[in-house]
A protein has these predicted regions:
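Conserved alpha-helix/loop element of class I SAM-dependent methyltransferases that forms part
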Residues: 1-10
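Conserved class I S-adenosyl-L-methionine
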Residues: 10-20
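Residue-level micro-sites within transmembrane alpha helices that shape
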Residues: 14, 69-70
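S-adenosyl-L-methionine-dependent methyltransferase catalytic module, highlighting the catalytic core
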Residues: 20-26, 40-41, 51-60, 64-65, ...
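Conserved S-adenosyl-L-methionine
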Residues: 29-35, 40-43
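Conserved SAM-binding motif I beta-strand of class I
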Residues: 44-48
Length: 169
């Protein structure tokens, strides 16, 4: 992602569904003991985590969303993805798990309540990306612990202004 942040000149981020993460904490980069903010050369890092009453949502260069969407009820997925895009000026990075979690909810159900294939998630993100044609997208899907697939970075404008009807990314 460091290369992508440089390529898109990312200076500000919103970690949408950040849990307890803090991009300003030292120790992210083992070689320098620097923070993620320093490692990625960011000016501003904002966080959103409704479970912790943390809401710094605002327009930024890049919105990051890791291990969140699979915890969202299927009927709400498109609204959440749309909101993620609405805060991005340049890039959206989504990582979604496509397998059951190791944890259960208090009612006994799996914590990953929307487990779908990588292609299903790609279709959901593509559908919303069409509403934000100038925003680039990096979608990473995980089919197991430490097993992931990154789709090529794209933006819907490439499809809309292309000379072909078939899209392959």
């Amino acid at each position: 992602m460091k290369r992508d942040f440089t390529l898109f000149d990312i200076k500000s981020t919103l970690d949408y569904g950040c849990g307890g993460s803090d991009w300003s904490l030292k120790g992210f980069d083992e070689s320098s003991n620097g923070s993620a903010k320093e490692f990625f050369r960011l000016d501003k890092c904002y966080r959103f985590e409704p479970a912790r009453d943390l809401d710094e949502r605002q327009k930024v260069d890049c919105v990051l969303n890791f291990d969140v969407l699979e915890h969202i009820f299927i009927a709400d997925i498109s609204n959440v993805i749309n909101e993620i895009f609405s805060y991005a000026a340049k890039l959206v990075v989504i990582n979604v798990a496509c397998y059951p979690a190791g944890a259960l909810l208090p009612n006994g159900e799996n914590a990953h309540i929307t487990v779908r294939s990588p292609d299903w998630w790609k279709a959901q993100v593509d559908n919303i990306a069409l509403r934000y044609p100038d925003i680039s997208v990096l979608l990473i899907t995980s089919t197991g612990y430490m097993v992931s697939q990154a789709f090529p970075i794209y933006k819907a404008n490439d499809w809309l202004n292309g000379n072909k009807f078939i899209t392959t990314t």
